[in-house]
Structure formats: C-alpha cells, structure tokens
Design a protein with these regions (language model features):
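Non-catalytic structural scaffold of enzyme domains
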Residues: 1-267
Length: 267
C-alpha cells in the first residue's frame, strides 16, 4: 500500500457528495474516487440482500482502482455493518459516524432528533448509540422516505419538499428537541431548509466532519496520509451523469473534478 494511492468513497447516489466535500476540505492533498450508484438509488427501501450485493460490486470496482481506503458515505450501508467489511480487503474501511457525543454536547436537556432513512431508523442503532452515551437522553427518530427522491430529483424549491420537511420536523417541535442529526448523507443538501423550519434554537448537525476525522486517524495509523500536493476528485456514477454534475456543483469545486459514467461490472 502506498500513500499516493487514492481514497475510495461510495454511496447509493449523490448524498455522499456531502461527505466528499468534507473529506476534500480536511484532506486537501488526497486523491478521491467517488462512486454513486445512481442507477439503483435509493438504497434505504431495498432489502438487506440487495444492498449487500450492490455494495460488493462497488467495493470490487474500487479495489481494482487500487484504493488505499474506502469511506462508506451512506448511513444505510454503515448500519449494515462496516465491521463485516473490515479485514476482508487490503485497505481500511470507514463508516459514517453516529455523532452521539456531538449531539449530546449540543443538547443541554438531552432532547435529540434523528432524521434518517427507513432502514437506518428501523435498525435502531443511532438511538442505541445515543442512549449508551447518556441513558437519560430522550431520542426522537423519524424516518424520511420522501427526502431522497426529492433531493435526487433536484426538487429543492418545490412545495413537496417544504411539506415533507414540515411533516418530518413536527415531532421535534412538539417534543422540544434541541439538536437534530442528519443521519443520511443526502440530507445536508437541504440542511439550510431544515434549519429554517426548526428555527434558531435547534442545532442541525452533519456527521461528515466526525467521519472525515475517523478516516484521517486510520490513514495516520497506517502511515498513508498525504501531506503534500494538490488532491484531485474523480466523481463516478452509474446513471444520470449530467444530473450528478449539477448536484456536485452544490457541494464541490467542480473545476477540480473529473466526471464519468461507469459500469460496475467492468473495470
């Protein structure tokens, strides 16, 4: 393994671009290869068997690109168990941080909201992680099945999105929630709208920074952290290249990016 090798980042669609943004900011010397499986998004409503099969294809594709690390920029995939991938490949695998300590620090009365996909909410793992850190915490998990299709469909100014945000945040308002975590990497695309809906007294948190910090720790431990040169971004998707380029423009310095349409069955 060589420190000049790229870092792989994967997601079910465009959501992971929000994590790639943070990774690029915190690791400016690294090269990244991002894979968004836009042909089969969203993963949050898929069966576990389907999801594991899709992830296996992406991991195999990235392995052939000689990546030195893989960051799973998707909470649904992280919930399936990053541990099952560790040790089975010649690189470190980093999943999304649950952000428990970050949430508790931002919530004086320990009233916490979780916005996520149906799969992630059903797993119960975010709630368990928060309660393990503080058994007195009150956790309000809300599944948001409408968000990903609206974000992937670029419906950022639509009444449908405004209605969905109001619907999903209503339980938080009733409960007096003080901090909310965006436990799906798509949701930072609409973070400002969610913040506006909840008001200035509620902190809306994105776990991308904590995830990026985990990636840095793993690279340092393996002696693979680059400290010189300008990093490059390669953004790959399995469908809808033009749409991915537009959405990437909301998160990334597109002049530093190469975009390509890929077939995961070919390397």
């Amino acid at each position: 393994m060589d420190k000049m090798q790229p870092i792989g980042v994967l997601d079910s669609g465009v959501g992971g671009l929000s994590v790639l943004k943070c990774l690029h900011q915190m690791l400016p010397h690294e090269d990244f290869i991002y894979v968004g499986d836009t042909a089969r998004t969203p993963y949050g409503t898929r069966t576990e068997k389907e999801i594991r099969s899709f992830v296996g294809e992406i991991i195999d594709w990235l392995t052939a690109k000689n990546v030195k690390q893989v960051v799973i920029a998707c909470n649904t995939l992280t919930m399936l168990g990053v541990d099952s991938l560790r040790g089975t490949h010649p690189f470190s695998v980093v999943g999304m941080s649950k952000g428990a300590q970050q949430l508790l620090a931002a919530s004086p009365h320990k009233k916490i909201g979780v916005l996520a996909t149906q799969f992630t909410i059903a797993s119960g793992l975010h709630k368990k992680a928060i309660l393990a850190a503080d058994p007195q915490a009150q956790v309000y998990p809300v599944a948001c099945p409408k968000f990903v299709p609206l974000i992937e469909g670029e419906q950022f100014d639509s009444p449908e999105l405004r209605q969905a945000i109001a619907e999903y945040t209503e339980p938080f308002k009733k409960a007096g929630v003080e901090a909310v975590i965006l436990s799906c990497t798509h949701y930072p695309f609409i973070k400002e709208q969610i913040e506006a809906d909840l008001g200035p007294n509620v902190k809306v948190l994105d776990p991308a920074a904590a995830t990026s910090a985990d990636a840095i720790v793993a690279l340092k431990e393996e002696g693979l952290l680059r400290t010189e040169g300008k990093g490059h971004l390669q953004v790959c998707c399995t469908a809808d290249l033009a749409r991915v380029e537009r959405l990437a423009g909301r998160m990334l310095p597109v002049d530093d990016c190469d975009f390509s349409l890929i077939d995961l069955k070919k390397n």
